[in-house]
């Protein structure tokens, strides 16, 4: 029988050495699910609360014993003997048990670890892979799954690194690949080429939190030039095989007192409109098709201007802006702000809510990108979520560090298993990509 007979939680460590939560769910019939949750460093102010101990005698206050104890007592007792296949019912029980808007009583980390473990136990009970079970929960009718195109963060800055770059992520996107396996190969080759480019210039190859290189460079343009050079040295073509994407994490750059965006590495500051012009110039020159958090989460006027200026030719992603929250996404839809959402399950705190946000975004014409966090674990749930919802895109770092490659390896296995029942999202299906490619190819024209 699929009734829950036990839930066990423990404190483990993530890729930064910080504690996080892992949970097991066991059923009467002997099936079980195991899941752990990640943690971010650059946080949106309205993310669901990650419960920490704040006991500075352990892990500088970052321990999660409170969360573990809540799962092993309160949550466990509330879910015993419930059918493990009742995902939405179980998630609702935990959300109501918490009783707050931001999950501050039980903690989003507590609820999500159990929520994902529930799904894995249910998938095991039903004899299907997790992505197929998620597709069933999501209501996907097609038997053909879209494999997500990876957005690979190969150079880190901002809060993800101890260097001088203000832009937080510089990503390569292998849109010209035929399948996920080739996309991963391209990402690996370009990353190694970038290492050689940096080495030959005597530039540090130290790594940031997400495994990308974290050099000190004279400007963001120079960073993009080096990435372009690494693409060329890998025998790929920018604007054909590969395009670029950036995460500005602009909330970290926004100076509230002046209302300006401060780029310390280039010793300049911009108004909202000037920052849009700056980003537009970079995009046109370096074939950047996607800009994440190109304005502060508090600067809705700036985000509206960004969307008005670039929304028809680029993918404009809301991360801190939306924090995987349906109410904030609805506000963005109503105000015509951004055209894409980054989906981080731990920002909202349950699988059911995550799937509902993806559905809302897609129904509203927003593209969806399922994403990791800077502090990751070996859990591969986001790969299954990306496939099970045919999200289209995934962010899970460079092809380096096992907490990142575990997701890539999971995608390789899924694609191999699905064979003809999968298609790679690729160049023809990404929002506004064709328009951006045209702009890049005609960048010298006066248009």
UniProtKB/Swiss-Prot annotation:
Mg(2+) binds at residues 247, 292, 319. The keyword Metal-binding applies. Pathway: Carbohydrate degradation; glycolysis; pyruvate from D-glyceraldehyde 3-phosphate: step 4/5. The active site is at 210 (proton donor), 344 (proton acceptor). It is an enzyme of class 4 (lyase). (2R)-2-phosphoglycerate binds at residues 168, 344, 373-374, 395. Keywords: Cytoplasm, Glycolysis, Lyase, Magnesium, Metal-binding, Secreted. Transmembrane segments: none annotated. It is found in: Cytoplasm; Secreted; Cell surface. Its cofactor is Mg(2+). Binds a second Mg(2+) ion via substrate during catalysis. GO terms for cellular component: cell surface; extracellular region; phosphopyruvate hydratase complex. It catalyses: (2R)-2-phosphoglycerate = phosphoenolpyruvate + H2O. One of its GO terms (biological process) is glycolytic process. Belongs to the enolase family. Component of the RNA degradosome, a multiprotein complex involved in RNA processing and mRNA degradation. Catalyzes the reversible conversion of 2-phosphoglycerate (2-PG) into phosphoenolpyruvate (PEP). It is essential for the degradation of carbohydrates via glycolysis. This is Enolase. It comes from Blochmanniella floridana.
């Amino acid at each position: 029988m699929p009734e829950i007979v036990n839930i066990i939680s423990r404190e483990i460590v993530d890729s930064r050495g910080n504690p996080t939560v892992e949970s097991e769910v066991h059923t009467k019939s002997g099936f079980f699910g195991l899941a752990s949750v990640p943690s971010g460093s650059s946080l949106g102010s309205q993310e669901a609360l990650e419960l920490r101990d704040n006991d500075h005698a352990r892990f500088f206050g970052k321990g999660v014993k409170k969360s573990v104890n809540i799962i092993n007592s309160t949550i466990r007792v509330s879910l015993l003997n419930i059918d493990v296949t009742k995902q939405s019912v179980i998630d609702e029980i935990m959300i109501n048990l918490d009783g707050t808007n931001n999950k501050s009583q039980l903690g989003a980390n507590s609820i999500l670890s159990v929520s994902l473990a529930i799904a894995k136990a249910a998938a095991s009970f039903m004899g299907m892979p997790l992505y197929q079970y998620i597709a069933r929960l999501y209501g996907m009718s097609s038997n053909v799954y879209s494999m997500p195109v990876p957005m690979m963060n190969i150079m880190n800055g901002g809060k993800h690194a101890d260097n001088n770059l203000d832009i937080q992520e510089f990503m390569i996107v292998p849109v010209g690949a035929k399948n996920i396996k080739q996309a991963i190969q391209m990402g690996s080759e370009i990353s190694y080429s970038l290492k050689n480019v940096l080495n030959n210039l005597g530039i540090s190859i130290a790594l940031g939190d997400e495994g990308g290189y974290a050099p000190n460079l004279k400007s963001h343009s120079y960073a993009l030039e080096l990435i372009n050079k690494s693409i060329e040295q890998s025998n790929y073509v920018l604007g054909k095989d590969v395009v670029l994407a950036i995460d500005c994490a602009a909330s970290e750059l926004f100076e509230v007192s002046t209302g300006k965006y401060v780029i310390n590495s280039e010793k300049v500051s911009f108004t909202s409109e000037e920052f849009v012009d700056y980003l537009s110039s970079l995009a046109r020159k370096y074939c950047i098709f996607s800009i994440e958090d190109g304005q502060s989460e508090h600067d809705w006027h700036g985000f509206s201007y960004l969307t008005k200026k670039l929304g028809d030719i680029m993918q404009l992603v809301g991360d801190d802006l939306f924090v995987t929250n349906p109410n904030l996404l609805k506000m963005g839809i109503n105000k015509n702000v951004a055209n894409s959402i980054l989906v981080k399950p731990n920002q909202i705190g349950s699988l059911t809510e995550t799937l509902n946000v993806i559905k809302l975004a897609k129904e509203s014409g927003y593209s969806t990108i399922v994403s990791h966090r800077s502090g990751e674990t070996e859990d591969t749930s986001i790969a299954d979520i990306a496939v099970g919802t045919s999200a289209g895109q995934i962010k899970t770092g460079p092809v380096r560090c096992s907490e990142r490659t575990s997701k890539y390896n999971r995608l390789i296995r899924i694609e191999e298993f699905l064979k003809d029942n999968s298609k790679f999202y690729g160049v023809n299906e990404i929002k506004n990509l064709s328009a951006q490619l045209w702009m890049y190819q005609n960048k010298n024209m006066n248009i």
